[in-house]
């Protein structure tokens, strides 16, 4: 759902969305790796989503969407969450169901929406949906990008030396925990390929499957990279601007 920076848009760059979460990948007739999106919607964290950070995601929620654990404006029956805008509803129902004065509630150190509140929106709502979304053959995969949330140590982007080295890089992924994970927030947790909560079998067997994929694809295997958008400076501010500017890194990866 990325929107290219202004300079890229002036050059004619466009970004089309096939999926934002799950990719099912298989070898195509030409020997390359292809991927489809098995889902028919988008599932995202609400807090922090706004018209500046992810306008296409927000536009996708305008109809037929499901919101969980967000706040509700009781005056007009609309939803609200932190960073949606700077105008929390005065007559609000916070995520646990209590009726509160939104600005006063926030000023007291509370959250109107749960930090891990979510939205689920139909794929058809996406203004940048790729024309290849319904293609049963999928789309060719040019690169595989792993990444974790690390405030230090890990650079913005680097490339693996080989497919197997890329599998190793994915296997040692670590990420600082957020409200989406159980337990303490802000602790670096080992999360191989960001799949720890989702892999239903032994991780060693999972890595073996990846290595076998590389053997099957041979010299047509996509290159593997690792990114870290979340490095911070000594004052705790993000060094990289993120969002649409991530296209600068993706351009380097693809070229």
Please state what every model-predicted region is.
Residues 1-75:
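Catalytic or ion-translocation cores adjacent to nucleophile or general acid/base/metal-coordination motifs
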Residues 47-50, 55-255:
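Conserved NTP phosphate-binding and transfer environment spanning the P-loop NTPase/kinase superfamily
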